[in-house]
Amino acid sequence: MGLEERLPGGILLSTVEKVAGYVRAGSLWPATFGLACCAIEMMSTAGPRFDISRFGMERFSATPRQADLMIVAGRVSQKMAPVLRQIYDQMAEPKWVLAMGVCASSGGMFNNYAIVQGVDHVVPVDIYLPGCPPRPEMLLHAIIKLHEKIQQMPLGVNRDEAIREAEQAALAVPSTIELKGLLR
């Protein structure tokens, strides 16, 4: 029994934002930015055992211009940070970022001058995925949570304001390396 049989007269009510969110969530094309051991777990997620294609993500994009999800897997060095930002800027709107692993989320065990202490100091992050490295099941769960977040995103001018506020808030936070004396 389908939805058409339940509603009288074939009427289906929704908003444009909900329909667009549903379509966007079902067709994510991730750009992989695998830098360390988390990339191995990300590759196994695309394998037949976990089958990431169930979520419309069977195509990993090699170019940022065709991707709308950046999965940052692993630590980001200070020299790699401008490259990461450039790749993020080349992605078309709408775009989302998933920080995979504790190194991408907070620098991990690499608390030194050469490693960015959280990729959120370079690009705005939508989903943080903890673990060292996180299991493929955790990545699939994070993708499901990202789908829920995408379906709630506004469109048009409201989306532009939400993106601008999120990016300014993420970049205004002091980096962990500046707080180094306070953490010990």
UniProtKB/Swiss-Prot annotation:
Compartment annotation: Cell membrane
GO cellular component: plasma membrane; respiratory chain complex I
Cofactor list: [4Fe-4S] cluster
Catalytic activity line of the entry: a quinone + NADH + 5 H(+)(in) = a quinol + NAD(+) + 4 H(+)(out)
Membrane topology summary: Peripheral membrane protein
Residue ranges that the Swiss-Prot or TrEMBL entry lists as coiled coil: none
InterPro entries, alphabetized: NADH_UbQ_OxRdtase-like_20kDa (IPR006137), NADH_UQ_OxRdtase_20Kd_su (IPR006138)
Co-factor binding details: Binds 1 [4Fe-4S] cluster.
Free-text function comment from the UniProt entry: NDH-1 shuttles electrons from NADH, via FMN and iron-sulfur (Fe-S) centers, to quinones in the respiratory chain. The immediate electron acceptor for the enzyme in this species is believed to be a menaquinone. Couples the redox reaction to proton translocation (for every two electrons transferred, four hydrogen ions are translocated across the cytoplasmic membrane), and thus conserves the redox energy in a proton gradient.
Subunit details: NDH-1 is composed of 14 different subunits. Subunits NuoB, C, D, E, F, and G constitute the peripheral sector of the complex.
Name of this chain's protein: NADH-quinone oxidoreductase subunit B
